[in-house]
Amino acid sequence: PHDLARRQRQMCIRDRLTDQFRIFTAEKFIKSLEGPDSTQSDIVAGANRDRLYVFIGRPQEWDNENNPPTPIDSFQEFSDSYDDMISMKRVLASDAIQVVRRIDWIPPEQTTGGLGYVYDMYRNDYSSSKTASSGATKLYDADFYVVNSSYQVYKCIYNGTSPSDPNGKPSTIEPTGTSTSIITTADGYRWKYMYTIPVGQVLKFFSADYMPVLIDTAVQSDAVGGEIDTVVIQSSGSGYNNGTYENIPLRGDGTGGRISIVVDGGRIVSATVTSGGSNYSFGKIVVDEVNGIGSGTGSGGAIDVIIPPKGGHGSTPAIELGGFRVMINTKFTYSEGSGDFPTDNDYRRIGLVLNPFKYGTEELADAITLSASNAVIFSPDFTGSFN
């Protein structure tokens, strides 16, 4: 029993909250504000729709106004927040959205030396031993997607990585267009158009650090699960027979994948996907087994097969780009709510309250604005009048 308890403790220590679970939680959080049917009224939806409110509070001064205390995750802090709460405003489903890091496409003239920025390419296997060009050890930390000057978002499918340029090449041409096919620019980059951020969403959710993640239904419907878009020469090898080798099948659990290899000077100089196939969750190319390429004299060539996300590129942008954060945007308008928001008070605390009840009942609140002030407490030495 003691050994079992020890193993259980070790399992708890080693477990971690994965990014995929965080994305799932973010999606469920927003969906909870909508409920099973967004067309239902609050009365019909009842407890099936969460009521989330942003509150302001703490009208009294801190001991040091220029250095307020760091919030503490404790029951006492929780109680204090309720005690000094002033007003609340409801957060609707339309006020919340999943967001990802904002990564701008940068013109070469704005980069050091004017050479352009090297973006990471999408890979399914980043790790501490296989890092991105930026040094990232996992995909969601990599700079593998961009938003252009027209608020169009693209995923970098290939950045020029090769044995001679193991970290890829600078991007010098801004990706544009909304084609559902892979977009190749003259600098050798290959981009997948993901979606465009509408003006309204730009104004509401596009910040200096984050941007909304959305779905383009045309891109989503065109996505092919397990379709291979990219192969990368890991090692050129030597001693191979010069020529072009076509229709080379991909080994893996999918079907229909084919590539073409070009050998010059005994080394692999090009590897291109000619048919992406479908349903690949793993795949590989064994160069030395390609018919006629080596005849026993060539060796050392290696080609990586880049496995796409489940469902294909563009099928689930929140999962593909790492939408595990939620941005909430709601405005407190001057004196709104018929007095729910006093205009002559400062506030020093802001937070979220889930499913508050109407005062004196166990009925969920549903108003857009609420007053959270049930009483006013004066210090013993207070003098003056109160109306």
Residue ranges and their predicted role:
Residues Q10-C12, T25, E61, I328, ...:
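Sequence-pattern detector for short linear motifs
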Residues P1-D15:
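Single conserved hydrophobic/aromatic residue that forms the stacking wall/gate
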Residues R14-V224, A302-G323, P342:
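Tryptophan-rich substrate-binding surfaces of secreted polymer-degrading and adhesive proteins
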Residues P1-D3, A136, V146, R251:
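Generic marker of residues within folded, mature protein domains
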Residues T185-N387:
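Conserved, function-critical positions that sit in or immediately flank catalytic
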Residues R9, Y151-Q152, D264-V269:
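Beta-strand-connecting loop/turn residues
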